[in-house]
Amino acid sequence: MLASGDDAYNIERSLRFNSADSTYLSKNSSDGNGKTFSISFWIKKLGFQYEWPSIFTSSLDTNNRVAITWNNDRLQFYALVGGTQKINLVPSRKFRDYAGWTHCLFTADTTAANSSDRAKIWINGELQDTFDYAG
């Protein structure tokens, strides 16, 4: 997919997801245990919105799912395993730079006994340790 029609915005191997197009990527895989994983990507937010659009979602069923969404101008990382919430993090960092790209890395270990060890979020290489909500 190409951004806009302008070649200046054409970044090799990049994707642009426009909600009006209902575009998405999918991968069906049985690799791994689904309890420990990492997700890494570059993102550029195009504007402020009060909705909670999904950046990434994956689910086996309604009781086993993971999602990364926009929560107003923050990111939210959420995981439900066996019907129990294992991860729900909303870092305090706000995304208000609509011109720049941001690197995000999310790691999860839903088997960890201590809730603070279950998930970590890095934004532009900085571990996020201040949260508006962490549960």
Segments (PLM) and residue ranges:
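Surface-exposed loop/edge segments in extracytoplasmic proteins
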Residues: N63-V66, T84-L89, E126-F131
